[in-house]
Amino acid sequence: MNKWYTEDYEFTIEVIGVSGGGKTEGHCRNGDEVGDIYKCGYDCPVNQRGRGFCSKSMLLLFPMLETVRGGGDLRMIGGFSPSGNVPDSPLVKEFVCPDGVVTYRLTAKKTGGENFHTGGFYRE
């Protein structure tokens, strides 16, 4: 792989809650535990143990990543804060996995890189 472009955002996805008494066995197929942290740019998120992000939850996450990359505000796409503890920021959002088991907090951080499309990197 030749990653030649520096992404304009980096993303952190933290596991902040797991239903079922916090135990993943019998609940979370991916094995997510409170405190697990996934990171990514444009690639798929990977946690501190090198394990990939839940494929079902990725269906929810990807549109949020694109919202940020497109200059959008995560507060404007609806939802709520399951923990009731989200900073008032356009770059932070909590969401629950499709199975209703794991609660994640997405945080985006601007890297200083230019947008892939408006920065002149994309070529047809």
What are these model-derived regions, one by one?
Residues 2-19:
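Short, basic/aromatic beta-hairpin or loop at an interaction surface
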Residues 17-19, 46, 110-112:
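Beta-strand elements of well-folded, non-transmembrane domains
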Residues 26-48:
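Short, flexible N-terminal segments of the mature chain
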Residues 49-72:
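Short, compositionally biased
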Residues 72-124:
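Short, compact, well-ordered microdomains
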